[in-house]
Every structure is written in C-alpha cells, then in structure tokens.
Amino acid sequence: MSDIKDTVKRLMAMRDLDEIFALEDDTDFATALSSALCDWTNYGEHLDLLSPEAQVFYLCDQLDNEINSDGFVSFIFERYGQWAPETVDALETIGAPQTADILRRAIAMLPDGVCPRDYTQRNDLLFEDEDKYYTAYNALDEEFYAYPDGTLTDLYVTYARDHRDCFSAPEK
C-alpha cells in the first residue's frame, strides 16, 4: 500500500510537462497533468491562464472526476458547474458527443436551461427543489457511467497527447 501512496504522491507533485508527457501509463499521465493544471489554476479559479487545449483537458478531467465521485449534482452545484457550457464544448472537442448531450440535458433541467456562473445562485437552485435534481441527475449519472463514447479518460488523455505542443506552464 505504501508503494501506491508514494507513486500517487510523486505523480501529484510533478510539474515538469516534459516529464509528465513522457509518462507511458495513461492513468499516471492523467493524474500528473490534472494535478499540475489544478495547481497552476488554483483549481480552476484562473482557468484563463491555460491554453484552450489545456482547458479542454482540464474541464473534461474535472467533469469525469466529479461525476465519478458524487454525480451530476456535485458537478453542477459545486465549483465546476460554472464552466458547464464550456465543458459541453470540451466534450465535443475530444470526440464525446453523447456525453456532451448528457451534460446538455443536465443543464437544460435548470431554470431557463442556464447554469448560473455564481456558486451561491447554483446552490440556491438545488435547495429550492433538492429531490427533483437528485432524482433527475441520478438517472443522468447512470447514462454517464455507461460511457457511451468510450472511456472519457482515454479520450481526453489522447487529446492532450495529440496537442502536446499547446501545453505549457503559465507565466508566474
């Protein structure tokens, strides 16, 4: 167990992109690149510091992590919901149109079909009708878990590797 912890710690501490992109194992690569991008953007707070291609990886990775952790309720109503429309575009970009459609339907369930950028506004919506959102989003979670476009991680890792020259550490 200690070896696994040490490996994860090592991957999450990597910041050299040449070293990260040299990783052969896709899971190791995704872990290391995700950690670096989270660090460089303060968990998305400064997403604009990343290239459009790095943003695509970041948004798809965060969606994948959130849905597999706590489902669409977590993604929409927590931090990353503010980028829900951009995440739809990112999914299309990596070749995941069916997953993009699932997210589009999650957004469409919100009033006026709009996911507010503001965290408090999103949470107010959730607390107004918690049962409705949990029930509806649980059904979408199941669709997501079927990976209709294939494993999402494979798609965004392939995309990142294909666009290596577009990834760089932001200027300090």
Regions found by a protein language model. Give the residues of each.
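Extended, alpha-helix-rich binding/interface surfaces that flank or overlap catalytic cores
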Residues: 2-58, 64-69, 73-77, 81-84, ...
